[in-house]
């Protein structure tokens, strides 16, 4: 049993014998100073009024009761105005090893998510180019978060939303089409915002190699063909990059399918019937202000084209229709202003605002020896996720992406990540693991074998302060894993390891 859980059970027994209720404001937490014990509690302070006695007097009675009834405690002391400082016996901490041994890979698993279906949508980059390092951070956070939630008992489905409709996709088709015409020696006029990446030229050349007569098509047909081929080529590349990064989405959901199957229009009709939409200036608007947004939002523009928001409402409605109790979206921090309107949309389709969680991912600054690397595709400069993974490896890249809170800016120093020094958090953790494996290897070479089951008698020498501190640290993992799931904060695991 976890130390906090064990102590709470003992405290509850003491209160029951005193005919006192468990107070809502009771806290049991690790002591700020190890000299003052393993755990500290304010139980006497928050129970004094109900007991009708001064906090220190009540604390003294509780301490005496604990000393007499709980043999796993080495000491219980009263401090300050009535705090209780508790130190567990070495035997209690050594029992932690038995629990870890018995649970094996399941050690730390929780059941807080049992019976709850969660969808985690992450990355969802427009298929207009290869994934960059910002997408890599989102991939690492989303994938790790899904793993943590599963570990906590949630039924998790991971999903990638393919933005294959709208202006950006039309622009992709146009960019490839113009490059193809240029390769054919046809003069073209370039729009200001076309896609300039060298990958566009590669796709156009590939299409021309397969179909030399491509540019004889009409502009409309040529752009459509270039869009379809280009999007699929880029999407295949994205999937391959994610596989190399050990990220596998269970579902790939097409935005275009929402439009083609009438889901967007159906959503419009529902909003209209609920009195949550209105026409103004030839456009269709959603009354998001009814749900606390700072202004109403356009769903369909005056030219008849749909906004991204329109598709996003239909998409989130579809998520809940598929039976998910909770939806987690992992977005770039530049979408922070989008959160209130999506919360409004979720409520408009009949869900609670808290049924949608949004994890924001801040920018990644790529550095080389402390100097920022320009984000371009020129030779020798790293921009894409594939480039970074090739340079430092999957493990190092994933760990670095998770080494800070997701909503904090991250400096990713390529030189530091490759350093074999304690300044490199990746090396620090890997080195600790290597040392442990080395101890086990040398023990085997010396003919020492570990018993199949933990023999507590063999652990008696583990009584030094450093030994007990390590056991206490291992005991904390259950709370760390559970807390990471509840807070949607994968970095809690990284911090624990560091």
Task: Kindly give the residue locations of the regions a language model identified.
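Non-catalytic interaction-recognition regions
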Residues: 1-94, 105, 109-498
């Amino acid at each position: 049993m976890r130390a906090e859980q064990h102590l709470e059970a003992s405290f509850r027994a003491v209160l029951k014998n005193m005919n006192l209720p468990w107070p809502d404001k009771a806290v049991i937490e690790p002591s700020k100073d190890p000299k003052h014990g393993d755990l500290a509690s304010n139980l006497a302070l928050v129970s004094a009024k109900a007991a009708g006695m001064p906090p220190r007097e009540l604390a003294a009675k509780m301490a005496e009761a604990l000393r007499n009834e709980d043999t796993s405690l080495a000491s219980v002391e009263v401090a300050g105005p009535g705090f209780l400082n508790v130190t567990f016996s070495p035997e209690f901490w050594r029992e932690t090893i038995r629990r870890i041994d018995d649970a094996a890979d399941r050690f730390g698993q929780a059941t807080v998510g049992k019976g709850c279906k969660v969808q985690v949508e992450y990355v969802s980059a427009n298929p207009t180019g290869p994934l960059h390092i910002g997408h890599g951070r989102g991939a690492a956070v989303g994938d790790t978060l899904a793993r943590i939630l599963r570990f906590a008992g949630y039924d998790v489905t991971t999903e990638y939303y393919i933005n294959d409709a709208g202006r950006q996709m039309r622009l992709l088709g146009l960019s490839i089409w113009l490059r193809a015409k240029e390769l054919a020696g046809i003069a073209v006029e370039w729009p200001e915002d076309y896609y300039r990446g060298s990958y566009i030229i590669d796709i156009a050349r590939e299409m021309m190699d397969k179909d030399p007569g491509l540019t004889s098509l009409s502009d409309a047909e040529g752009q459509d063909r270039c869009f379809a081929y280009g999007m699929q080529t880029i999407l295949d590349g994205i999937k391959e990059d994610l596989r190399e990064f050990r990220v596998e989405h269970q579902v790939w959901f097409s935005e275009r399918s929402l439009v083609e199957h009438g889901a967007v229009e159906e959503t419009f009709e529902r909003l209209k019937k609920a009195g949550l939409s209105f026409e103004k200036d030839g456009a269709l608007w959603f009354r998001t202000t009814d749900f606390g947004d700072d202004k109403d939002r356009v769903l369909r523009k005056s030219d008849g084209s749909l906004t991204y928001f329109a598709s996003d409402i239909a998409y989130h409605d579809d998520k809940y229709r598929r039976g998910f109790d909770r939806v987690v979206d992992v977005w770039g921090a530049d979408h922070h202003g989008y959160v209130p309107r999506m919360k409004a949309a979720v409520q408009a389709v009949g869900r609670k605002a808290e049924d949608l969680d949004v994890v924001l991912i801040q920018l990644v600054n790529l550095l080389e020896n402390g100097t920022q690397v320009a984000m371009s595709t020129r030779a020798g400069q790293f921009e894409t996720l594939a480039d970074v993974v090739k340079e430092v490896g999957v493990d190092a890249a994933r760990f670095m992406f998770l080494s800070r809170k997701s909503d904090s800016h991250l400096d990713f120093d390529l030189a530091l990540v490759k350093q074999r020094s304690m300044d490199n958090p990746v090396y620090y953790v890997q080195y600790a693991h290597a040392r442990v494996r080395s101890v086990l290897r040398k023990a085997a070479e010396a003919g020492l074998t570990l018993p199949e089951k933990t023999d507590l008698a063999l652990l008696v020498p583990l009584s030094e302060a450093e030994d007990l501190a390590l056991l206490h640290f291992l005991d904390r993992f259950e709370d760390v894993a559970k807390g990471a799931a509840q807070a949607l904060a994968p970095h809690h695991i990284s911090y624990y390891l560091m």
